[in-house]
Amino acid sequence: MYKVYPDERIDVKKEQQLIEQYDHIVFQFPLYWFSMPPLLKKWLDEVLTYGWAYGSKSGYKVGGKKVTLAISAGIDEREYAHNEKYKYTLKELLRPFELTFEYIHADFRPFFAYYGIELNSTTEWIERSVPLYRQFLEEFAKQ
C-alpha cells in the first residue's frame, strides 16, 4: 500500500471500485504495535465511507463479501496468550477488524498469521511461510 500511495493520498473511488470487483478480499500486513500499520487505518477510514460501505443509502457495497487478514507477527505465537508477556491472543487483538467488517455486513473469516518474523527473518524462515500461506489462500478462495 505504501508503494501505491507513497504520499499517503488514497484514491478512494479507485479503491472502492476495486473492492466492488471481488467477492474475496485479503488484507495483508505486518502487525504494527499490536494493530495495523497507519496507512491501512487511513485506508479503512477513507474507503469504508458512509453511503458506500454502510448507512441507509449505501447498499452495503462490501456486504456479503468474504474478508480475511494475512498477518506477519514479529513475536512467537506462544507469547500471544493470557498467561504470557503480551496478555492477549492475536484473535483478541484483531477483534476491531472483526467488528468493523461485521458492521458493514461483510463475512469476516478466520485469519492467517505467520509468527516470529522479528527474530527469524532469514530467507529460509520466510520461505517456510509460502506453502502455508498458499494453502490458506486456496482454502479461502473455496469459501
Per-region residue spans from a language model:
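Short, solvent-exposed loop/turn segments at secondary-structure boundaries
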Residues: 8-10, 81-83, 120-124
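Generic recognition of short, well-ordered alpha-helical interface segments
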Residues: 35-42, 62, 92-96, 128
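N-terminal beta1-alpha1-beta2 submodule of the flavodoxin-like/Rossmannoid cofactor-binding fold
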Residues: 1-57, 131-143
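Glycine-rich phosphate/pyrophosphate-binding loop and the adjoining helix
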Residues: 94-143
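Short, glycine-/small-residue-rich phosphate/pyrophosphate-handling segment
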Residues: 62-109
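Short, solvent-exposed loop/turn segments at secondary-structure junctions
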Residues: 32-33, 74-76, 116
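Generic structural signal for helix capping and beta-alpha/helix-loop junctions
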Residues: 4-6, 77, 118
